[in-house]
C-alpha cells in the first residue's frame, strides 16, 4: 500500500508478460529512442527537437552524462508562463534535476510506484550513468492495465 498525501492506493499485480515469473520489466516496455539536448542548448532548441520527434520530453546531457529532464510542463511553467525568451534561456536553467531514474531490469510495478511518489509522468531508464530509454505513464498503462489505479491517483493529485 502506498500513501500519497491523504490517499491510500492499492497496487494489484496479476501475472502478465513473457517472463517466466509473469513480472513485466521496465526494459520490455520502455521507449528506446530517447531524444537529448546539451545543458547549454536553448530551450527553443529543445522545443524544436520535441516537436520534430513528437515527444513530450528530452534528457539533458552534460559531457555525455544525463543530468536532467525537460518536459512540456517545465517549458510551460518556467518559460511560457513567465513570458521568458526560449531562445536565450538554457536547458540547464529549466531542467528538472537531479534526474529520477530506474534500472532496466526493475519491475514495472516499481516504476509506477516511483512515478506516483515523485509525481512524475516520465521516468528515464539508466544503467551505469548511461541512458537506455524512457518510460511514460502511458507505456505502463498500455502494458499493464493493473497499474492503472496507481497512475490514476498520480494524475488526480498532480
Task: Annotate each predicted stretch with a short phrase.
Residues 26-29, 42, 46, 59, ...:
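Residue-level detection of beta-strand scaffold positions
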Residues 50-53, 58-74, 115, 123-138:
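A glycine-centered beta-loop-beta connector
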Residues 2-6, 31-35, 47-49, 65-72, ...:
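Short, mixed-charge, low-aromatic patches
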Residues 13-33, 71-101, 107-116, 134-158:
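Tandem CBS (Bateman) regulatory domains
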Residues 1-19:
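N-terminal amphipathic/basic-hydrophobic helices that include classical n-h-c signal peptides
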Residues 7, 54, 81-85:
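A signal for specific C-terminal beta-sheet/loop modules enriched in small/flexible residues
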Residues 36-54, 61, 101-119, 126, ...:
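The conserved cystathionine-beta-synthase
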Amino acid at each position: 500500500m502506498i500513501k500519497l498525501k491523504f490517499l491510500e492506493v492499492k497496487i494489484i499485480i496479476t501475472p502478465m508478460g513473457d517472463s517466466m515469473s509473469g513480472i513485466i520489466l521496465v526494459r520490455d516496455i520502455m521507449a528506446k529512442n530517447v531524444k537529448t539536448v546539451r545543458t547549454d542548448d536553448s530551450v527553443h532548441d529543445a522545443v524544436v527537437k520535441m516537436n520534430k520527434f513528437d515527444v513530450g520530453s528530452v534528457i539533458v546531457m552534460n559531457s555525455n552524462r544525463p543530468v536532467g529532464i525537460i518536459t512540456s510542463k517545465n517549458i510551460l511553467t518556467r518559460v511560457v508562463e513567465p513570458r521568458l525568451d526560449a531562445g536565450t534561456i538554457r536547458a540547464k536553467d529549466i531542467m528538472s534535476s537531479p534526474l529520477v531514474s530506474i534500472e532496466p531490469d526493475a519491475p514495472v510495478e516499481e516504476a509506477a510506484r516511483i512515478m506516483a511518489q515523485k509525481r512524475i509522468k516520465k521516468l528515464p531508464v539508466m544503467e551505469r550513468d548511461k541512458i537506455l530509454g524512457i518510460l511514460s505513464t502511458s507505456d505502463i498503462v498500455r502494458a499493464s492495465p493493473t497499474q492503472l489505479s496507481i497512475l490514476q491517483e498520480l494524475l488526480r493529485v498532480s
